[in-house]
């Protein structure tokens, strides 16, 4: 059984958090985590010309589902906003923003890597947090089960925290509850936080597939079943359901 991510200090439980929320499995788990540990939670998403923009609709379904799941979470869940980050789609040539096949380059990076995406997302989220008087940012990046993106690494996030605080004269804290969890452990975390109801909500409402497919339902959710994101989610589900745990 996966260990639960370390609880945030008790002194933060009367504070607010801003969750970078895409509508995917990872950010859904992070949103539930934040709702468990912070007194007020707001969310921010990004429209950047992604092929799988169905995730923007999934966000609304997940938010509604979380409100219905637990009254205390509904009371803590605050405003949501989606920011226009379309410039990423304009300047990038990737399989997430263009009609292109998913492959790997000479560095071993998949063509789904959007250069600067998470760097920009954290910066925009920090600006929102500054305006809203929020000190804690929560994101679902990890470097265990991930696609090799350099902007998901722990070193990147730690460096960003320093840079954002220097550049904004703030004391922001960037939380990454999934950083050292694999996908099986992320499913376990959802179960620990919200029971089978949160697992079911994640299966039915959250979206992962890079191709944006919602026509085919699998036991782990909707998607093509073939892209790297679907395969990671499916493999994690299998280990979670069949008890083999983390590899």
UniProtKB/Swiss-Prot annotation:
Alphabetic keyword roster: ATP-binding, Ligase, Metal-binding, Nucleotide-binding, Queuosine biosynthesis, Zinc
Top enzyme category: ligase
Origin: domain of life: Bacteria
Record CDD domains: QueC-like
Gene3D superfamilies hit by this protein: HUPs
Molecular function terms, GO-annotated: ATP binding; ligase activity, forming carbon-nitrogen bonds; zinc ion binding
Pfam families per record: QueC
Record-listed E.C. numbers: 6.3.4.20
UniProt KW Protease keyword: no
Cofactor note: Binds 1 zinc ion per subunit.
Binding of Zn(2+), residues: 209, 224, 227, 230
Residues engaged in binding ATP: 21-31
Cofactor (UniProt): Zn(2+)
Pathway: Purine metabolism; 7-cyano-7-deazaguanine biosynthesis
Catalytic activity from the UniProt record: 7-carboxy-7-deazaguanine + NH4(+) + ATP = 7-cyano-7-deazaguanine + ADP + phosphate + H2O + H(+)
GO biological process assignments: queuosine biosynthetic process
Function of the molecule: Catalyzes the ATP-dependent conversion of 7-carboxy-7-deazaguanine (CDG) to 7-cyano-7-deazaguanine (preQ(0)).
Family label: Belongs to the QueC family.
Name of the protein this chain belongs to: 7-cyano-7-deazaguanine synthase
Organism, as annotated: Halorhodospira halophila (strain DSM 244 / SL1) (Ectothiorhodospira halophila (strain DSM 244 / SL1))
């Amino acid at each position: 059984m996966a260990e639960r991510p370390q609880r945030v200090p008790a002194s933060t439980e009367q504070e607010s958090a801003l969750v970078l929320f895409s509508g995917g499995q990872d950010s859904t788990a992070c949103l539930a985590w934040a709702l468990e540990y912070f007194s007020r939670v707001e969310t921010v998403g990004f429209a950047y010309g992604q092929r799988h923009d169905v995730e923007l609709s999934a966000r609304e379904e997940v938010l509604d589902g979380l409100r219905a799941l637990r009254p205390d979470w509904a009371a803590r869940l605050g405003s949501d906003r989606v920011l226009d980050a379309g410039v990423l789609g304009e300047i990038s040539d990737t399989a997430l923003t263009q009609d292109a096949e998913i492959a790997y380059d000479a560095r071993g990076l998949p063509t789904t890597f959007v250069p600067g995406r998470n760097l920009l997302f954290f910066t925009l989220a920090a600006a929102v947090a500054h305006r809203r008087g929020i000190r804690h940012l929560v994101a679902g990046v990890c470097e265990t089960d991930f696609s090799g993106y350099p902007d998901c690494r722990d070193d990147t996030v730690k460096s960003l925290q320093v840079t954002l605080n220097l550049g904004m004269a703030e004391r922001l804290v960037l939380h990454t509850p999934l950083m050292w969890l694999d996908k099986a452990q992320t499913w376990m975390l959802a179960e620990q936080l919200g029971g089978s109801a949160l697992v079911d909500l994640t299966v039915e409402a959250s979206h992962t597939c890079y191709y944006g497919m919602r026509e085919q339902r699998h036991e782990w959710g909707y998607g093509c079943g073939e892209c790297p994101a679907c395969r990671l989610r499916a493999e994690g589900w299998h280990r979670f359901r069949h008890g083999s745990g983390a590899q």
